[in-house]
Amino acid sequence: MSDPVMDAYTQAYNSSGNMVQAFGVISESGQVLWQSNNWDLTADASTLMSAVKSRASSVIQNQVKYSTMRSTPESLVARNVQGSGILILTKIDTTSDRWVVAWADAQAQPDGVYVDVDRAAKTLRGKI
């Protein structure tokens, strides 16, 4: 049996042209439920969720500051102005407290990579 989160990560990676390079799932309470082995969300999961809820103008992940480009109650897209990439949070579904967090290469188009991550997140409905 395959890992549904790894499958979603692979989908986002492939559909983004290899731009999505880190992936995780966190709960609204800040619990890390799954993360790819190339980053650690544990220290920042709670503050990431707070940033989404408050529609913060910036968010910090792994000591890197990202400026919020777009924020809704169910998503956040932020870019590091020094070129350290794009951070995306999107809710798996409206009735869940689970969120996908993804990091994409700085060369990615924010709107396009958001769509790739959101589509991958939606495949996780009821699976995590």
Swiss-Prot record:
Any Pfam family: Profilin
Record keywords: Cytoplasm, Cytoskeleton
InterPro entries per record: PFN, PFN_sf
Compartment annotation: Cytoplasm, Cytoskeleton
Gene Ontology annotations for the cellular component aspect, listed alphabetically: cytoplasm; cytoskeleton
Recorded GO MF terms: actin binding
SUPFAM superfamilies linked to this entry: Profilin (actin-binding protein) (SSF55770)
UniProt similarity note: Belongs to the Asgard profilin family.
Function description: Has no profilin activity against rabbit actin.
Protein name as it appears in the record: Thor profilin
